[in-house]
Amino acid sequence: MDADKIVFKVNNQVVSLKPEIIVDQYEYKYPAIKDLKKPCITLGKAPDLNKAYKSALSSMNAVKLDPDDDCSYLAAAMEFFEGTCPEDWTSYGMLIARNRDKITPYSLVEIKRTDVEGNWALTGGMEMTRDPTGSEHTSLVGLLVSLYRLSKISGQNTGNYKTNIADRIEQIFETAPFVKLVEHHTLMTTHKMCANWNTIPNFRVLAGTYDLFFSRIEHLYSAIRVGTVVTAYEDCSGLVSFTGFIKQINLTAREAILYFFHKNFEEEIRRMLEGRQETAVPHSYFIHFRSLGLSGKSPYSSNAVGHLFNLIHFVGCYMGQIRSLNSTVIAACAPHEMSVLGGYLGDEFFGRGTFERRFFRDEKELQEYEAAELTKTDVALADDGTVNSDDEDYFSGEARGPEAVYARIMMNGGRLKRSHIRRYVSVSSNHQARPNSFAEFLNKTYSSDS
């Protein structure tokens, strides 16, 4: 008998077949640089910087930006941001710069130029008669790359969030060492015709390059990161959520994974952890792998590890974390099952801790404590008297740990307890739920059961 087949009748005729469904055909690509070549983009002919500045500023005021021209200008303007490398900087086997080297963002990528001239039109109606200063160049660069951050803010229910961000960015780039170039609300108005610029490959690479540079190099103009910081760990929300989760519950990655009682975690954990990437290397290309074009379909995104992502944020919801309540549920990754496991794990770690004495008056007291521990004599609670028997589970080692949690789930038939449901409803009902968020899911799923 073939375990993959089902048998049924059609018009009294027995049919045996193997059900086939649509599966994910995308190949997850790890962002390793194997040929020791820096990320590369191709742009038009290098412009005259002063002419390019006047054209880019004019087009911003006229809300008629040309992405090819602006990318060409952003690449050429990298020369204004020279800094000193504080130590040898390597990534994926490549030497980016040596200690004390003078470098610019241009040092991080390879930019090829063609002979194609840019448009460099003066669409704003007013032509500058003088050449721009260095501060004016850096201010315009800051405004242009900020279009990346604004274009990453999506959704209909953001309220005034995007407008407030745009206004704050404008304030930064009209304050020293920058200078005011545009009128109030110009950035938000301009963004509306550039709402999809985060999908333009060259613009994305340039934004990531500027962010990688300023995250490493102390610089007068480092505030430019206000517009590019979203390129760091882009399409990496699954791995970022997992990292935050293990810090939140104060466990190692190995200890945390022991609590993941579901078969669908197996492939996701393998995918997320086996890539042998520079996840722990400071200032690596890995941090900006998506914006620098080093990976097509990220193995670290929320969709790539959807069950893991759902579980982590259901635990976060149980603990009342706003970020988790606002996050978007991955609907195709068993959210109902993950909410059950999330309730048990939330209950396991919420309002409890593992404590021990770590500081002592002198070495003699330390030695006495260690000797007592060796003989299994608990002196850690000596100053607190006895433990109430009603709270015994909170202090009993046998009641904590993955085995204990798994046993509780099995004893309850894989269903949430009433106390778990009440907690979920409590945190979600007091929160203004965004569409498709975890808060909305919990409200719709459990509010009638509380």
Swiss-Prot record:
The protein's name in its UniProt record: Nucleoprotein
Entry superkingdom: Viruses
Keywords from the UniProt entry: Capsid protein, Helical capsid protein, Host cytoplasm, Phosphoprotein, Ribonucleoprotein, RNA-binding, Superantigen, Viral nucleoprotein, Virion
The keyword RNA-binding appears for this protein: yes
Organism: Rabies virus (strain China/DRV)
Note: Displays a superantigen activity in human and mouse, activating mostly V-beta-8 subtypes of T-cell receptor.
Location(s) in or outside the cell: Virion; Host cytoplasm
Record's keyword annotation contains Repressor: no
Family per record: Belongs to the lyssavirus nucleocapsid protein family.
Lineage start: Viruses, Riboviria, Orthornavirae, Negarnaviricota, Haploviricotina
Main localization (coarse): virion
Posttranslational modification: Phosphorylated by host CK2. Unphosphorylated protein N seems to have a better affinity for leader viral promoter encapsidation. Phosphorylation of protein N in ribonucleocapsid may stabilize the interaction with protein P, thereby playing an important role in viral transcription/replication.
